[in-house]
Regions:
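SIR2/sirtuin-family catalytic core signature
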Residues: 1-77, 261, 323-475
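Extended, H/D-rich, highly charged conserved domains that either
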Residues: 95, 100, 116, 120-156, ...
């Protein structure tokens, strides 16, 4: 009965199956929980559907394709709440903080009606906490303009709600940090390998751009453990200040014995937190990043530092932020979204999304604009599609040939990804050199990228001197 019902992508995903589209696939390939292809007439790479599609088959199909895409001139990674959920489940068995609905005691009905209207206008069935905070902010500003005495009550309630939310984020970080050693190491190992698969680019290629909608600091912790140098718009050491101008700073080093020829340092990435961060605070006319430890018990003591000028939870730069006393209400988010557009809307650009549910219309519009450039490519990786926005974005797009889809309990599992499907989490010059040597010697393409296909190698006619010449040229 279950197999008969699973005929659409949504049903397959709901039943823990997988949806895949890579390489020359023209349509989505549906594979159920048992590994059977639901629509074999659409699948050209499983001629005999009597066999199940296992991880080895998936790997031979996915890993070479992603390895090729990751060599694009411009590579970007967009992470949503799914990455925090994945690491939290590995570390302590729970999904961590989610954007659950909150209840206002002041103007409850009015806020609820406005939230529902806003959600429907953006194509979502129901609103979330971000919608509720945004509507409450708008209402609060209106009440202050009118001089309504209820503005004080609403502001106090907003303060409590945001404080509780910040505390819940810190609690999720703490649960990861204090989980049992074996589970914590396993979770961190998966996170490190995941990030290194993207950041392991040679120094002469453009830096990886990491974008995230998350408020927590999980990606920063993973990068620190992996030895990845992150660069952002903040300048300073003790209490960095957000810089409005976008300077393309980079990291170089001087090789020993060589002067005047600096080389790009490997393992460097740029990070942009599109919705703000738990440790960003508005102080006066500036935005600062405070020294908030990962998993701290309470944020309030760190807001009482000298120089923050009475900052409280309402000054946290959590989108949509409550501290909108600037003439530009969208500051600094306009600059952050501009960085996203400038990074991905370029020829020969590849963007990989992981754990992003396509619930943000601002981001979706930028992704749609990116796909209007023929040489760009979008890879969507997700464990599921809970609000149906991923498949909706795909079905409505006119650029399906520029999209790869990996959705499901197998394909979206971060452990399976790092173990089987993502490229090596290292700069693998040895494999590249071996492939080039084989091609030069044998005159045929190497089958390293697809080990399931047996090599068809003719006897080499290359003499020893020619072989030595090839080796010398390679080295």
């Amino acid at each position: 009965m279950e197999e008969q019902q699973a005929k659409t992508p949504q049903e397959v995903i709901k039943n823990k199956g997988n949806v895949i589209k890579t390489r020359d696939d023209r349509e989505l390939i549906l594979i159920d929980l048992k590994g059977k292809v639901v629509n074999p007439e659409k699948c050209s790479w499983t001629p005999n559907n009597s066999e199940t599609v296992n991880n080895s088959v998936f790997r031979s199909r996915i890993e070479p394709w992603l390895t090729s895409l990751f060599q694009s001139e411009h590579l970007s990674l967009l992470c949503g709440s799914g990455i925090t959920t994945a690491i939290s489940l590995l570390a302590y068995g729970k999904s961590g903080t989610t954007m659950e609905d909150i209840t206002f005691s002041n103007y409850k009905d009015e806020i609820g009606a406005a939230v529902d209207a806003s959600a429907k206008a953006s194509g979502r069935e129901k609103g979330n906490m971000e919608d509720q905070i945004r509507v409450a902010n708008d209402l609060l500003r209106g009440l202050k303009v009118l001089g309504d005495e209820n503005a004080v009550k609403l502001e106090e309630e907003l303060h409590t709600i945001i404080t509780n939310f910040a505390t819940s984020l810190l609690s999720s970080e703490k649960e990861i940090a204090i989980s049992s050693e074996d589970k914590r190491e396993n979770a961190y190992r998966a996170l490190i390998n995941f990030l290194l698969s993207f950041a392991s680019r040679t120094g002469n290629k453009e830096r990886l751009n990491i974008f995230t909608t998350n408020y927590d600091r999980l990606i920063e912790v993973g990068a620190e453990l992996a030895g990845i140098h992150l660069m952002d718009r903040f300048v300073g050491t003790i209490m960095p200040i957000f810089r409005s101008s976008r300077l393309n700073l980079d990291l170089h080093y001087n090789p020993p014995g060589i002067r005047g020829e600096p080389r790009y340092l490997e393992g460097v990435a740029r990070i942009t937190k599109l919705h703000g961060s738990l440790d960003w605070v508005q102080s006066g006319g500036e935005i600062r990043r405070i020294g908030l430890p990962f998993g701290a018990a309470n944020i309030n003591p760190y807001l009482e530092a000298p120089g923050l000028q009475g900052a409280d939870a309402l000054k946290l730069m959590i989108y949509p932020n409550s501290a909108k006393d600037r003439e530009t209400a969208e500051y600094p988010y306009v600059e952050l979204f501009r960085d996203l557009a400038a990074s991905i809307c370029r020829p020969n650009s590849t963007l990989v999304t992981y754990g992003y549910g396509f619930g943000d219309e601002h981001i979706n519009r930028v992704l749609s604009d990116m796909l209007t450039i023929p040489s760009t490519h979008l890879v969507i990786i997700s464990y599921d599609d809970p609000i149906g926005r991923i498949l909706k974005f795909y079905s409505e797009s006119a650029h399906k040939d520029q999209m790869s889809i990996l959705i499901g309990a197998n394909l979206g599992d971060i452990t399976n990804l790092t173990k089987d499907y993502l490229p090596k989490s290292a700069i693998d010059r040895a494999t590249i050199r071996m492939a080039e040597l084989l091609q030069n010697r044998m005159g045929v393409a190497s089958n390293i990228a697809n080990p399931t296909i047996p090599a068809q190698i003719e006897p080499s006619t290359t003499n020893e001197s020619a072989t030595e010449e090839i080796i010398n040229s390679e080295s």
